[in-house]
From Swiss-Prot:
This is NCK-interacting protein with SH3 domain. GO terms for molecular function: Arp2/3 complex binding; cytoskeletal protein binding; SH3 domain binding. CDD domains: SH3_SPIN90 (cd11849). Transmembrane segments: none annotated. Highest expression in heart, brain, skeletal muscle, kidney and liver. Lower levels in placenta, lung, small intestine and leukocytes. Weak expression in colon, thymus and spleen. It is linked to A chromosomal aberration involving NCKIPSD/AF3p21 is found in therapy-related leukemia. Translocation t(3;11)(p21;q23) with KMT2A/MLL1.
């Protein structure tokens, strides 16, 4: 911990302005003239001139509290940015956490009596963000790439270490194998010369020269730079009565984010002694001022844990969602931002606010996390909607034309149901859908079957799609219900309603996306005639389909249907394909999907994941010479190019490589490949490389078995490439 001896204000873009007496936690000695520090009061980070600071000794507990405050400040800044952590913020958190561990280790056995910060909100959000951000950097990967300094390499400031900065932000400095002790500062040499001559100066103004770390060079690729301990500033021989002008490059000050040092120029010297005499305080005042900035003692945190109910997070979520209509995730973000801001603005409330944030993170199921006797509002509304729709389904008068004026009421119910299924807590929705063996879901399916109004049918289809995204068990229920049969019949009988036709194809693809077995009775409506109907739409289109969206949806539906047909001799899709005279457009769309490596049927992340629909379809196509002939010669050459490229690019142990090998084996077996031998040398080299692999994983063993079978059946494949 360091305390500011003098007030400082600068127009530098990354410099922190501070008053005399403020305390700082030094995070990095970026250069000889600028140190990266965190303000103990608020956790704000920026660059400060070391000549203005004096180190405070024996304040480990206050250091820990300042570190906790800085961690929360970074977390609050990320929450204000939507809960996403930048690379710089991740680096600061890594540094602060490591600094905290080093401080605790230096405290010795006495540290065991102190409540160590458990899995904090900052750590939780950091790990969650690293898992879902495309550009996130996980902690393990960070530590592998940037080794942290060990405790024996640290000086008196043993918790200090560097954050790797982008090379474009680091000022050019000399690189060397190891830091060496720098020569004494100019002012110190002058003072020593004067003392040697017997005319030592009486000016006791502090100089920032000797407080500079000897290892001031910065490396962008390593955290192992070693620092020597800094000694307190020594009196110099002379000092300018006023600080020199500060280099100016801008007026904006960036907080809570790692930035390059303000400039390579020297930092301003502290003001003259007569200008700051009134601003200096005693050491006891330093301790008292620092004590007022503490986050609270261990006893206060323990009391906060007892005072804050474990259900407070769920109660806040329920209140915000009911009164604002925000989605479940947006409610969580909003509460996190508000509580984090209160925690930063009112330090006395920090222990309580931390417990609120923890309860917000730990609450998985909103309906279970609420206090006993309190029911989630979304759960209540789902009960009402499901019950009323079931009553209307069972009402015999509902089917009378005279009661069609209830369409507005049913529409409101279905729109509210869709809104809840989309925005509410998924755990609440899953629990309500699974109640009484999916009674509510099956009631909606029966209602869809008897409802003939297109607008209501469209809303029901949207609700079915939202249910499919909740859980794989709901998809299994819909597969076994009458819904697939009703959708297939509706698609073939009513081709005039383009929007309903598109939604029907989409929902059918969702229902069949998991590759589960279909009841045998369904194939009466999902057999070869239905497959031919879909192929006709792909090849010829419909007059009302001006957007050309329907052919792509029908391709996806054919791929999803084929997942349910393991036996090639009973594959109704392949039977329809062999009877179709021309499938040029369909084959081109298959090639496009194969080239991209996309699986349009894999819509959800439910487990277990089905096979790759495009690869399975092509394997079935080339399982018989009758269907293998659907591709034109040029398309066939392109298909071989794509397959060979994927086999070469995929790494050993990848499950997809086995699928591509099986596809290539089927192509060689059912097409005249040995006549044209397209890409044969490349294929031979790839197969020999796979045979020579030393990996022993089950996937690699399966790959080698397929290659041996190919070379045994077609000897030319096992020959050395010419």
């Amino acid at each position: 911990m360091y305390r500011a001896l003098y007030a400082f204000r600068s127009a530098e873009p990354n410099a922190l302005a501070f008053a005399a007496g403020e305390t700082f936690l030094v995070l990095e000695r970026s250069s000889a003239h600028w140190w990266l520090a965190a303000r103990a009061r608020s956790g704000e980070t920026g660059y400060v001139p070391p000549a203005y600071l004096r180190r405070l000794q024996g304040l480990e507990q206050d250091v820990l509290q300042a570190i906790d405050r800085a961690i929360e400040a970074v977390h609050n800044t990320a929450m204000r940015d939507g809960g996403k952590y930048s690379l710089e913020q991740r680096g600061v958190l890594q540094k602060l956490i490591h600094h905290r561990k080093e401080t605790l280790s230096r405290r010795g056995p006495s540290a065991s009596s102190v409540a160590v910060m458990t899995s904090s909100t900052s750590d939780h959000h950091l790990d969650a963000a690293a898992a879902r951000q495309p550009n996130g950097v996980c902690r393990a990967g960070f530590e592998r790439q940037h080794s942290l300094p060990s405790s024996e390499h640290l000086g008196a400031d043993g918790g200090l270490y560097q954050i790797p900065l982008p090379s474009s932000q680091i000022p050019p400095q000399p690189r060397r194998a190891a830091p060496t002790t720098p020569p004494p500062p100019v002012k110190r040499r002058d003072r020593e010369a004067l003392m040697a001559s017997g005319s030592g100066g009486h000016n006791t103004m502090p100089s920032g020269g000797n407080s500079v770390s000897s290892g001031s060079s910065v490396s962008s690729t390593s955290l192992d730079t070693l620092y020597t301990s800094s000694s307190p500033s020594e009196p110099g021989s002379s000092c300018s009565p006023t600080p020199p002008p500060v280099p100016r490059r801008g007026t904006h000050t960036t907080v809570s984010q790692v930035q390059p040092p303000p400039s390579k120029a020297s930092a301003p010297e502290p003001p003259a002694e007569e200008e700051v005499a009134t601003g200096t305080t005693s050491a006891s005042d330093d301790l008292e001022a620092l004590g007022t900035l503490s986050l609270g003692t261990t006893e206060e945190k323990a009391a906060a844990e007892a005072a804050v109910p474990r259900t407070i997070g769920a109660e806040l979520m329920e209140l915000v969602r009911r009164n604002t209509g925000l989605s479940h995730e947006l409610c969580r973000v909003a509460i996190g931002i508000i509580v984090g801001h209160i925690q930063a603005s009112v330090p006395a409330s920090s222990p309580v606010m931390e417990q609120v944030l923890l309860s917000l993170v730990e609450g998985k199921d909103l309906s279970m996390a609420l206090p006993s006797g309190q029911v989630c509002h979304d759960q209540q509304r789902l009960e009402v909607i499901f019950a009323d729709l079931a009553r209307r389904k069972d009402d015999a008068q509902q089917r009378s034309w005279a009661l069609y004026e209830d369409e507005g009421v049913i529409r409101c119910y279905l729109e509210e149901l869709l809104h809840i299924l989309t925005d509410a807590d998924p755990e609440v929705c899953k629990k309500m859908c699974k109640r009484n063996e999916f009674e509510s879901v099956l009631a909606l399916v029966a209602y869809y079957q008897m409802e003939h109004r297109a607008s209501l049918r469209l809303l029901l289809l949207k609700c079915f799609g939202a249910m499919c995204s909740l859980d794989a068990a709901i998809i299994s229920t819909l597969v076994s219900s009458v819904l697939p049969v009703e959708l297939a019949r509706d698609m073939q009988t009513d081709t005039q309603d383009h929007q309903k036709l598109c939604y029907s194809a989409l929902i059918l693809a969702m229902v069949f996306s998991m590759g589960e077995a279909v009841p045998y009775a369904h194939y009466e409506h999902l057999g070869t005639p239905f497959a031919q109907f879909l192929l006709n739409i792909v090849e010829d289109g419909l007059p009302l389909d001006t957007t050309e969206q329907l052919p792509d949806l029908c391709v996806n539906l054919l791929l999803a249907l084929n997942l349910h047909l393991p036996a090639a001799d009973q594959n109704v899709i392949m039977a329809a394909l062999s009877k179709h005279a021309n499938v040029k457009i369909f084959s081109e769309k298959l090639l496009l999907l194969l080239n991209r490596g996309d699986d349009p049927v894999r819509i959800f992340k439910h487990e277990p994941q089905p096979p790759h629909s495009v690869l399975k379809f092509l394997q079935d196509v080339f399982g018989s010479p009758a269907t293998a002939a659907i591709f034109y010669h040029t398309d066939m050459m392109a298909l071989i190019d794509i397959t060979v490229r994927h086999i070469a690019d995929l790494s050993p142990g990848d499950k997809l490589r086995m699928e591509y090998l099986s596809l290539m084996h089927a192509i060689v077996r059912t097409t005249p490949y040995l006549q044209h031998r397209h890409r044969l040398p490349d294929l031979q080299a790839i197969l020999r490389r796979i045979l020579n692999e030393e990996e022993t994983s089950p996937q690699c063993q399966m790959d080698r078995m397929i290659v041996r079978e190919m070379c045994k059946e077609f000897l030319v494949l096992g020959e050395a490439p010419s």
